[in-house]
Amino acid sequence: AGLGFERSDFDRPTKELSGGWRMRIELAKILLKKPSLFLLDEPTNHLDIESIQWLETFLASYRGAVVLVSHDRAFLDNVTTRTIEISLGKIYDYKVPWSEFVELRKERREQQIAAYRNQQKMIEDTEKFIERFRYKATKAVQVQSKIKQLNKIDRLEVDEEDFSKMNLKFPPSPRSGTNVVDAKELSKSYGDHTVLRKIDFRIHRGEKVAFVGRNGEGKTTFSRIIIGELGYEGHLKIGHNVKTGYFAQNQDELLNENKTVLETIDDAAKGDIRSKIRDMLGAFLFQGEDVDKKVKVLSGGERSRLALVRLLLEPHNLLVLDEPTNHLDMRSKDILKQALISYDGTLIVVSHDRDFLNGIVSKVYEFRNNTIREHLGGIYDFLRKKKIDNLKEIEKKDVPSKEKTGESTIGN
């Protein structure tokens, strides 16, 4: 149950399950073996927030060793006590969790830069001496000594460039109407399977909200209804002058495979941002010769990142983002997060990444049992309240809905 399976799922053939749910089965099989060492590569990618929290508790209290590859900050902070970074072919081992490591890495990079500059100055002075006295017989011994000195130098390197302070701003877009999306008694079914039942939903201009809930509860379905990809029953009105931008994991299919990475972004860039194209691509892990690769040779993750960068360059006043951080490293997520915080349009984001959502959204919509429930406040306000609600359920205390401040059920 911790990974989101209901008892009714236990007898279902695995061929009926999506790839994400099959990954959960594989994770459950590993956890049940109780090995002395867990090696988990991005274990949270196919989990919802509740399942991630359960896995955190399980791993944090596990008596064996746990090695994680993850880009989920909150998950790492709640589970790990040691951080190992691989940078420029070297391994750095810190006996601290992620957040403390970030501060120590910052200090290390500052020290590296200072040492690198001092070494470069010494190399430059030595080369000038060699060039000046190369053909002077009285200095021949000194020149040869300096040449040997240069050849023996262990050249210092500085860790990869830190793009976290890169200021990415969305291009200006037209102002939309006050009511951006207005749904009333909206329902959606796939055959006999009901996903959404008579839900009401309204988002106003400038609001930033999160869609959360277990996989299969309708978050992506409702997102696709909003952008016009899926039919529905009931009423849905998109506001005046709304220009929608949508990102999902399959958006990479819309890219022109015969264009290069740089050409793809150059076509979308307008105005002052054009001068920052290469920096943007570098921030999203396209560096050096990568920008000259054809789209058709990129991996699925690379295509997904490229589609996201292109979206950020286009003028939209409503953004609907479905798991935008799945293929991003932490620096890329930071840049995207800061851009979304300063974004003056309307935002709907489907995500299980608590650290990413924190500071962006001011309202959370929980998808559960074919309805959506509105929670005022940020993602951690929602999670704190969920813990209280779960305790109330365990204690079987009935709380009248009128007493549930900051929360309302939207749907019948």
Can you name each region flagged by the protein language model?
Residues 1-116, 165, 170-412:
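ABC ATP-binding cassette signature C-motif
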Residues 104-159:
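Intracellular alpha-helical coupling/juxtamembrane segments of multi-pass membrane proteins
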